[in-house]
Swiss-Prot record:
Intracellular or extracellular location(s): Cell inner membrane
Single annotated GO MF: quinone binding
Protein family according to the UniProt entry: Belongs to the complex I 49 kDa subunit family.
Protein name per the record: NADH-quinone oxidoreductase subunit D 1
Described function: NDH-1 shuttles electrons from NADH, via FMN and iron-sulfur (Fe-S) centers, to quinones in the respiratory chain. The immediate electron acceptor for the enzyme in this species is believed to be ubiquinone. Couples the redox reaction to proton translocation (for every two electrons transferred, four hydrogen ions are translocated across the cytoplasmic membrane), and thus conserves the redox energy in a proton gradient.
Segments crossing the lipid bilayer: none
InterPro entries: NADH_Q_OxRdtase_suD, NADH_UbQ_OxRdtase_49kDa_CS, NDH1_su_D/H, NiFe-Hase_large
One Pfam family per UniProt: Complex1_49kDa
GO annotations of cellular component type: plasma membrane
Bilayer disposition of the protein: Peripheral membrane protein
Length: 396
């Protein structure tokens, strides 16, 4: 009797796996405990966002961006607003820019807190998520006090932001900053020199810089491999060029370096937030939070009570929407997960002709086979945790 040739064992990872971070399904080919092939299956959260946007006005298209990376919603709104403003050829007032940057950095904290703590949970540490979610709750309240919503804020608007921030909110965000740095130190105390955490992350999924560029990585995935590439410094938008902050980079490009980069990025985000809060209190930080052009931004309720023209402009804006000059533009922002880009094509009507969304997580997940091949089965969850993927933007 001829002995059958040994063949690899195929298993499903997800889509209901707690370490899958959403509806991820991986088909893993195993040789014993060693992973020989990884086949990601996506599309379980596909909602046709890009097509839906083509049938909406520019204002109606905005809430779809909250639902992409739903961990840090305002960062995605930012890209769409900047793209539309570029086509309209408008600049927004200084106060509006500062508020946008402040809330983008709050979004970065929200995203990194979730990622770092759940990455720890994926390798067996249960305390960090409890501490991290306590801080996220405070940040969610800041979202709620600005926009009325904890998650899907719809706060950034074309031309600025929806409404000004109350001064008490600015004080409370300031009071949050320094104690939060202590929480970062506590989290590092739990994880950075933790023997088990290091054994599970050091040397796992090392990415050389050339490979990172080749796979289309961005954000922490390239900074962890040693490139100081951050769109806030490389291609500054809004008022980032006036702010002082550093770009942390890794040395080895492994899971552990990516964790360290995210921890330091949270500290830099707090630095940026404090600078924004200081500038918002200065005389040059006062003024409107959105452009005064009522063809783009609706007039205030007070104006509508006084002026028939304001009433008409408000009605036209919410029924018909504003018309955007024909053209095409690509705008990218440094979202917490990497370079989030919006390629927007306008045909001169009140609806986008095409809106292509460049999701950073999509490029990172596509390299899952490259990153995981040759590692152990137990390393798969550690690698997914260090990629920081979210399915809202991968499946769109």
């Amino acid at each position: 009797m001829v002995e059958a040739a040994p063949r690899n064992f195929t298993i499903n990872f997800g889509p209901q796996h707690p370490a899958a971070h959403g509806v991820l399904r991986l088909v893993l080919e195993l040789d014993g405990e060693v992973v020989r092939r990884v086949d990601p299956h996506i599309g379980l959260l596909h909602r046709g966002t890009e097509k839906l946007i083509e049938h909406k006005t520019y204002l109606q298209a905005l809430p779809y961006f909250d639902r992409l990376d739903y961990v840090a919603p305002m960062n995605q709104e930012h890209a769409f607003c900047l793209a539309t403003e570029k086509l309209l050829n408008i600049t927004i007032p200084k106060r509006g820019q500062l508020i946008r940057v402040l809330y983008c950095e709050i979004g970065r904290l929200l995203s990194h807190l979730l990622n770092v703590t759940t990455q720890a949970m994926d390798v067996g540490a249960l305390t960090p998520p409890l501490w991290g979610f306590e801080e996220r709750e405070k940040l969610m309240v800041f979202y709620e006090r600005a926009s009325g919503a904890r998650m899907h804020a719809n706060y950034f608007r074309v031309g600025g932001v929806h409404q000004d921030l109350p001064s008490k909110l600015l004080d409370d965000i300031w009071d949050f900053c320094d104690p939060f740095l202590k929480v970062c130190d506590d989290l590092e105390g739990l994880l950075t020199e933790n023997r088990i955490f290091k054994q599970r992350n050091v040397g796992i999924a090392e990415v050389k810089l050339a490979d990172a560029w080749g796979w289309g990585f961005s954000g922490v995935m390239v900074r962890g491999s040693g490139a100081a590439w951050d769109l806030r410094k490389a291609q500054p938008y809004e008022c980032y060029s006036e702010l002082d902050f550093d770009i942390p980079i890794g040395k080895h490009g492994d899971c552990y370096d990516r964790y360290l980069v995210r921890m330091e990025e949270m500290r830099q985000s707090v630095r940026i937030m404090k600078q924004c809060l200081e500038k918002l209190r200065l005389p040059e930080g006062q003024g409107p939070v959105a452009t005064r052009d009522h063809k783009i931004v609706p007039p205030s309720r007070a104006e509508m009570k006084r002026s028939m023209e304001a009433m008409i402009e408000h009605f036209k804006l919410y029924t018909e929407g504003h018309r955007v000059p024909a053209g095409e533009v690509y705008v990218a922002v440094e979202a917490p997960k990497g370079e989030f880009g919006v390629y927007l094509v306008s045909d001169g009507t009140n609806q986008p002709y095409k809106c292509k969304i460049r999701a950073p997580s999509f490029a990172h997940l596509s390299a899952m086979d490259f990153l995981t091949r040759g590692h152990m089965l137990a390393d798969v969850s550690a690698i997914i945790g260090s990629l920081d993927i979210v399915f809202g933007e991968i499946d769109r």
